């Protein structure tokens, strides 16, 4: 029995020495190469790192240096200077679900094809990372990203998972061609519904703040959005500029405020624009509202041959149509003023009060052709009282 006991003891000591030796070997360049090859072999993924570090003061954390990870034969999904992985007792039941993954100083490229990653974490932390998400409908690229996702359970078609809390900041970001800097995002994802409880950024030399919610079907509800001192030049015509609003199934605007904006396109421009819009829903090329309002004024508005100075517009929206409470502007050396109603039934515009004073207007050479041009679909009749 003594011999058997000593044999078991020596076997345990030998096993412990092998484990300790393997542990130290893994922290060498040779060991890192061997571990990378073992992790990549037959998995469909390509993993490489130069060195693994472990500190007994943090026994449940392992740090990998100069990490590259991605599908075999595809561009790398992750390139990072360091990756810190925190473990917990959960590894006994779910070895690929970490307590925490911290990515430092690198680039994370996520697409629907790479989203079905073989691991997850209670927390994913990004520190000074670049983030690219092509082919997802968002066309997102961000630099100097710091923040986190909790929990992080990626799956095919859902880069961040179906349920998560999000808090991130970015030094710069491009989303669907729109550039921004000093971006702050806080919110959550819940079964395809995205809630942005805090949204802030510097955009087009101005600032953007607000909150919004995106439904699983792609509809948006903007509870509050403020744009201040925007300076934007666009290559798009006015119709093309607003075209993205028609691509979503529904856009519900609770409150939109624009202050001191200057916008310019190839055949249109507006300067010193102040706008306040309340309770309006855009859907399928139309609009709906129960008690919406619009107040707008500017120093100058240009659209084609039309050139208005100091235009002021106040209107109210209802299921029956639009009540034009006030429209005044300086135009062609004079003044124009009107009020009335646009009626949804029959697409009829009824002007109650219209006045022109001091105009100096020359008809264009093709005025007869313009006169014979059919009215747009939303304006089937015009009545002056």
Mark where each language-model region is.
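N-terminal Sec-pathway targeting helices
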Residues: 1-17
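Outer-membrane beta-barrel proteins
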Residues: 87-91, 151-153, 281
